[in-house]
Structures are given as C-alpha cells and as structure tokens.
C-alpha cells in the first residue's frame, strides 16, 4: 500500500502541533532556493512543478485518501501507526477529526507564475493556514511539498541552461534557433530513481524542449498542465538498441543497416546505434557503401554513437585532423554526404543524414561540443544531444539549497517575525523574517518611476526580481506589485496554467536576457577543460 497522505511526512512533524506556543493561530512559510554553491552553472532557477504538487497531493490525494474516507478508518490507521512506531499509549487525533469534518485543506498558497526565472535567495512561494485551529498544517505539509517540487524545478533549470547554450550557438552558427526545441532530447528515465521522479524531472525538461524519450513526462504534463498528447508536447523517433544490432550478428551489420533503410523504414526519420562493434568502420565503410540508398530516401538516418569520449567522438581529437578519430563524426559525415554552407558561413549536413549522442552528456560536454563544432566551421545544430540521467539524476535538493522555512507566526493575536541565523553556518541557512513581497522591476517602475530599489533585496543591476521581508500581513496586503499571486486556497485551485503558457513565459524571460556572444558564465566555469585541451593539441 502507499502511505496515506495524512502520514506522508517526517516522523517529527507528527509532534510539532503540540510544541508550538499556546495561542498560536497562524504559521506562514516560504520556499526559497538558498544557494547555487553546488550549481555554479546557474545563478537562477526556473520555477516549475507547483501546479503538479497542488493537483496531485493537495487536491487528488487528500480528497481520495482522507476527506472521502470514513473518519473512523482514518483515525484507526493513524492511531495504530503512531502507537506502534512512536510508543504512544494515548494518541491525540482531534486535529485530524476537525480537518476531516471541515472537508477541505484550509491552506493558502501564493507563488510566482510557473516558468518565471528567480535568483538565488528569492522566495518563490508562500504557504499559510487560513483558519486559526489549523496552524499546525502549514509546516506539516513541508515534507511532501519539498520532496515533490525540488526535482522538477532543478531539472527545468538545467534544461533551461542547456537551451540557453544551444540557442546561443545556434544563433551564432545558423542565424536562428529553429530546431533547437528538438536538439535537447530527454534520455533520462531508465537512470532516474523511479518512474515518478522520471516523470517529474521529464516534465521540467519539457518546459524548454520537445524532444523526449520519457513517455511518463508527456502523460504528466497532459494531466497536470493541460498539454495535448501529441508532438507539440513531446516527440521522438524510431530507434534501434544494442539488442537489435546483436541479434543480427556482427557479420551482418551492413545488411542490417540496409534492411532498416529499405524494408523497415523506407521513409521518415530513424536512429541506429552504431558502436555495437566498430563505430569508425560503420562511419567510414558502411555508410559510404549505403550512400545512394540514404540519399534517395525520403527521410533521415540518424547515427548514434554510444561510447567513448562524447566530445572527441562527435568533434574529433584535433581541429584539423586527417584520420576519422581526429576528424570526429560530424566532419566524417560531411566528407561522405556533404551538405550546404549557410549565410553565416557554417556547414550544415545534408538533410538525409544526422547524428545524436546520448551517453554521459552533461552541460559542460554539450558546451564543449558546440564550441568545437563552431571552431571547425560546422553549424552546432548538426548534433542532437541525448540528455540522460548523467545530467538529471546527478542533483539533489541541495543543488539549489531549497528549503521551506517558517518566517511569520501569529501568537495570542500578535504577529511575530520568525527567522533562523545559525552562528555555525556560513550564512546559507539564514532565513528571511516576517512576511515577504517579491517585486518585478518593470511592475514597480510602471507604478513609481522614482522608486528607491535600495530598499529591496537582490542584485540591483541584473535581477528582474527583488524582494522585501520583515513585513506584516497588512503591509503585504497593501502592496500593489507583489509578484507572488494566489494559486490555491481552501481546497480550490485558483490558477490552472497550461504547458504552452509556461513555455511562452519562460521564452519571454529568455528574450529579456541578452544573447551572449562572448565568454559565458559556463565558459568561465569550465576553465582548463576539454575545450582548452583540444585547442592545445592543434
């Protein structure tokens, strides 16, 4: 059985209700990315996944597993579990009886619109109880909120960084970003911790790309973000795996390629994993032998290497190489199939042939491959990147230091500003205090062109979003430019954004950022990497 939603938390949460000061009637908390210490490749996050959390947990699961269940069954399960695990002889359940009788979650959530870019330490959402007797509920929900939302945010942020890199190189080498929506392809599902985490992460990927092999992600955004079940949401192509190649045997590999091209897929796109035995033999012998068939097909053959150093396999070990290994896959395909030189002066492979690489790709390697292709005179869109669990599973809640922390409470009718600031910490865990407003610069300036932004927190020169804490409820309610909007209250979803809306919002955020033609933050982070080592060999 799955854990009942009213017990889907940490053990210590069960006892917090009795620990708050007597007379507590309100608890107000925030969700904040506190640090990019472990993610120097991004100083901002893409806010995404809250609507999924609200629909799946606050609405569906609470309705199915709590409110619609007989009260006596709920109480019996709760009492039995707590007695047997916490050693309690008497188990207090009146708070659950009251909540069950109420029939909905007395919770209010305000949040940035999903698809918004938020800098480090900027609160992205707030949560509070709406009825005084349920003060305990706010932070009771912390665990399920945190475990559900950190991964789609982190994966959406990583996908966005891939998209920025690929967009920038596409503009430099082709003059547009056409096709980049399919240049980043999600390969991660098999390496994620579960189908659910693969779905959540895969939904984040789909905020920036349409290419995916993670089918659960498409159904996820269909259910939670009103996305159609078609290629505009996510799409892939037919492709072989090593079991198929091995089934025919090494001696018949050339005939297998021909069989696939002529009999199985006489038209359309398909991909063939090509390193089952001798990758460079496939590239330099089999593909030239099949050139006429490939060029006469109405479609594209996509070559997929799956081992070796990704950067060297795709771009070669030398900038001006002579052997296949020195030239790399893209240059070898150009030598065999040719193509065109675009207006920007970069080589674009013939439309009948292409390449994808999906083994051990990360942001640094994708950047290095793009950098090398540009240096060799090739459009960077000649390669598709399979972004797998080596990218998406290598992250935790600590990647951006996500934390839900109480910053305000009402006790005996008095609003109290709560905060933590451990002396043994480096400042990362220092929380905001009181209630919070988040300001979008353009909204503030529209209302008051003379506004003094020094009264707000954040990077005054770069960030679109700034924030102010230390406020009480009245001061927050009087603010006319709070970017945090109500999205859930008293069991009701107040905002139901589509994936299309979120994609458009994120694209608009991207358009506000200058396309970097010089050294990017990621390039600075790479320093003495595979890019530099390659250039030193020439």
Regions found by a protein language model. Give the residues of each.
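Gly/Ser/Thr/Ala-enriched C-terminal appendages of enzymes
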Residues: 2-61, 209-210, 214-215, 220-228, ...
């Amino acid at each position: 059985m799955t854990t009942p939603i009213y017990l889907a938390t940490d053990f210590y949460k069960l006892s917090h209700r009795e620990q708050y000061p007597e007379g507590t009637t309100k608890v107000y908390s925030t969700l904040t990315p506190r640090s990019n210490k472990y993610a120097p490749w991004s100083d901002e996050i893409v806010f995404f996944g809250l609507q999924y959390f609200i629909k799946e947990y606050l609405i569906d699961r609470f309705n199915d597993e709590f409110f619609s269940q007989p009260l006596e069954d709920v109480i019996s399960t709760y009492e039995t579990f707590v007695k047997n695990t916490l050693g309690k002889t008497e188990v207090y359940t009146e708070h659950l009886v009251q909540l069950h009788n109420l029939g909905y979650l007395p919770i209010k959530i305000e949040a940035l619109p999903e698809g918004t870019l938020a800098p480090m330490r900027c609160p992205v959402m707030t949560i509070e109880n709406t009825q005084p007797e349920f003060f305990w509920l706010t932070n009771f929900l912390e665990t399920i909120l945190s475990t559900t939302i950190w991964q789609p945010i982190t994966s959406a942020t990583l996908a966005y960084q891939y998209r920025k890199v690929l967009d920038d190189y596409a503009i430099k080498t082709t003059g547009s970003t056409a096709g980049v929506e399919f240049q980043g392809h999600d390969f991660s599902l098999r390496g994620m911790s579960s189908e659910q985490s693969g779905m959540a992460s895969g939904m984040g990927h789909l905020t920036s790309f349409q290419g995916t092999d993670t089918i659960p992600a498409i159904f996820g955004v269909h259910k939670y973000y009103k996305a159609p079940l078609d290629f505009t949401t996510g799409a892939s192509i037919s492709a072989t795996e090593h079991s198929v190649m091995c089934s025919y045997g090494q001696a018949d590999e050339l005939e297998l390629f021909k069989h696939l091209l002529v009999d199985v897929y006489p038209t359309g796109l398909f991909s063939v994993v090509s390193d089952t035995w001798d990758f460079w033999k496939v590239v330099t012998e089999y593909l030239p032998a099949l050139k006429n068939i490939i060029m006469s097909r109405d479609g594209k053959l996509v070559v997929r290497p799956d081992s070796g150093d990704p950067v060297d396999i795709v771009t070669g070990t030398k900038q001006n190489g002579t052997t296949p290994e020195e030239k790399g896959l893209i240059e070898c395909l150009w030598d065999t199939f040719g193509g065109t030189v675009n207006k920007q002066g970069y080589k674009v492979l013939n439309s009948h042939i292409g390449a994808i690489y999906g083994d051990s790709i990360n942001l640094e390697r994708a950047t290095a491959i793009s950098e090398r292709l540009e240096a060799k005179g090739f459009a960077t869109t000649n390669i598709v990147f399979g972004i797998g669990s080596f990218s998406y599973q290598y992250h935790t809640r600590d990647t951006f230091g996500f934390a839900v922390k109480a910053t305000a409470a009402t006790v005996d009718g008095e609003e109290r500003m709560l905060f933590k600031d451990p002396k043994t910490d480096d400042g990362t865990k220092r929380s905001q205090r009181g209630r919070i407003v988040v300001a979008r610069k353009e909204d503030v300036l529209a209302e008051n062109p003379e506004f003094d932004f020094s009264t707000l927190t954040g990077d005054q020169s770069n960030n679109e979003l700034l924030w102010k804490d230390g406020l009480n409820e009245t001061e927050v309610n009087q603010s006319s430019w709070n970017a945090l909007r109500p999205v859930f209250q008293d069991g009701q979803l107040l905002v139901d954004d589509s994936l299309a809306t979120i994609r458009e919002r994120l694209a608009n955020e991207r358009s506000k950022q200058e396309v970097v033609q010089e050294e990017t933050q990621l390039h600075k982070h790479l320093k003495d990497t595979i890019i530099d080592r390659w250039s030193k060999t020439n």
